[in-house]
């Protein structure tokens, strides 16, 4: 990545919207926006040590943003505090006729709600996915410490069986949509695209209509569950 992590130049800033997180972390800007198709808001926010808010799909318009996947693209915001993020999100959340995915949502009281603090003890769900074994030991210990010391607020659940299929179907939708939206650049001069993007587009062009349909059905069922 050309973008550097402001806290440690030898470490990754976290992904495709990492510039948005890095400018806030390095005090170049108090607020910023970014897009997420597969973790590109919440991961850079975590890696760069700022607050990242990826709202529900359709709350912030994507009008004017380079499209990767209509089914997955979601706009998010970055800031130094939850209140700062709420201030920016409040101004962006609205129905936009130029983006059919947007929905009406009353966001007028977002800032007031932040100032109130939680009105009840927060509850968290913890899933140990099949990738748990790939996490380094210190990270595992940190999670286990939280579970042990905040057990009244955390419920541990077995991972639903369909969770294992999420990465596969997400990848299909992501790469097929990317191939569709970027094929004009790919055909014109693919050398101007990154190696990773060229490979993703190449894979996206090879999936069948049935594979894409199955992935879309799976995503819909996952949302509804």
What kind of region is each of these model predictions?
Residues 153-170, 201-202:
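Short connector loops at secondary-structure junctions
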Residues 137-160, 182-188, 212, 216-225:
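Acyltransferase
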Residues 54-140:
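A short helix-breaking turn/cap at a secondary-structure junction
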Residues 1-92:
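Short glycine/serine-rich loop segments
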Residues 118-127, 169-223:
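Short helix-loop capping/hinge segments that flank enzyme active sites or metal/cofactor-binding pockets
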Residues 18, 35, 45-48, 80-87, ...:
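Conserved active-site and cofactor/substrate-binding residues in soluble primary-metabolism enzymes
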Residues 8-12, 102-103, 212-219:
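Short, flexible loop segments at the rims of nucleotide/cofactor-binding pockets, characterized by
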């Amino acid at each position: 990545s050309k973008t550097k992590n402001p806290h440690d130049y030898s470490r990754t800033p976290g992904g495709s919207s990492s510039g948005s997180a890095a400018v806030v972390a390095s005090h170049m800007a108090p607020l910023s926006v970014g897009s997420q198709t597969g973790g590109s808001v919440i991961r850079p926010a975590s890696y760069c040590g700022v607050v990242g808010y990826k709202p529900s799909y359709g709350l912030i318009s994507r009008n004017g943003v380079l499209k990767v996947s209509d089914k997955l693209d979601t706009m998010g915001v970055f800031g130094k505090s939850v209140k700062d993020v709420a201030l920016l999100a409040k101004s962006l959340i609205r129905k936009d006729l130029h983006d059919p995915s947007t929905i009406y949502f009353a966001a007028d009281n977002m800032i007031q709600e932040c100032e109130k603090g939680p009105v009840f003890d927060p509850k968290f769900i913890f899933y140990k996915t099949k990738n748990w074994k790939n996490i380094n030991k210190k990270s595992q210990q940190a999670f286990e410490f939280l579970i042990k010391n905040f057990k009244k607020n955390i419920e541990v659940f077995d991972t639903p069986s369909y969770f294992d299929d999420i990465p596969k179907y997400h990848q299909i939708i992501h790469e097929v949509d990317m191939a569709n939206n970027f094929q004009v650049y790919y055909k014109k001069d693919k050398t101007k695209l990154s190696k990773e993007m060229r490979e993703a587009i190449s894979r996206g062009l090879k999936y069948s209509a049935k594979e894409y349909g199955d992935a879309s059905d799976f995503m819909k069922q996952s949302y509804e569950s």
